[in-house]
From Swiss-Prot:
It is an enzyme of class 3 (hydrolase). This is Endogenous retrovirus group K member 7 Pro protein. It catalyses: Processing at the authentic HIV-1 PR recognition site and release of the mature p17 matrix and the p24 capsid protein, as a result of the cleavage of the -SQNY-|-PIVQ- cleavage site. Residues 21-96 form the Peptidase A2 domain. Active as a homodimer. Its EC number is 3.4.23.50.
Length: 156
């Protein structure tokens, strides 16, 4: 599973005890939280001994009485003992994200800052193609080595 940062929220599916849930990937949350209206009535829960901070005022906060088996978005095996409260959507916190091997990466730019400034001064608009109608290639051309002409002074 991969998601680019955009105006859309990063949501993914997980299967907990055989039941599918969709939740928001939340790297700022220490623990995963299931919305009270999605928690199956026959699954045991207890009043939580600790409160939740950062999600507004939650009057009823519960926690699963059991540690539950979970499959991540790419079938990663994990366990979770989620909190349960009245929130509009489920949150996948770092307790699950770490077990799933989640990582945040920021790729290095393809071009140096100097070359980017030169291209911008020449009228290049990032994401658009080169040329009069901005419909040319949008990705760098990959250099390919010609094995027959490799090195200095190749044979004639």
């Amino acid at each position: 599973w991969a998601s680019q940062v955009s105006e859309n929220r990063p949501v993914c599916k997980a299967i907990i005890q055989g039941k599918q849930f969709e939740g928001l990937v939340d790297t700022g949350a220490d623990v995963s939280i299931i919305a009270l209206n999605q928690w199956p009535k026959n699954w045991p829960k207890q009043k939580a001994v600790t409160g939740l901070v950062g999600i507004g005022t939650a009057s009823e906060v519960y926690q699963s009485t059991e540690i539950l088996h979970c499959l991540g978005p790419d079938n990663q095996e994990s366990t979770v003992q989620p909190m349960i409260t009245s929130i509009p959507l489920n949150l996948w916190g770092r307790d699950l994200l770490q077990q799933w091997g989640a990582e945040i990466t920021m790729p290095a730019p393809l071009y140096s800052p100097t070359s980017q400034k030169i291209m911008t001064k020449m009228g290049y608009i990032p994401g658009k193609g080169l040329g009069k109608n901005e419909d040319g290639i949008k990705v760098p051309v990959e250099a390919k080595i010609n094995q027959e002409r490799e090195g200095i002074g190749y044979p004639f």
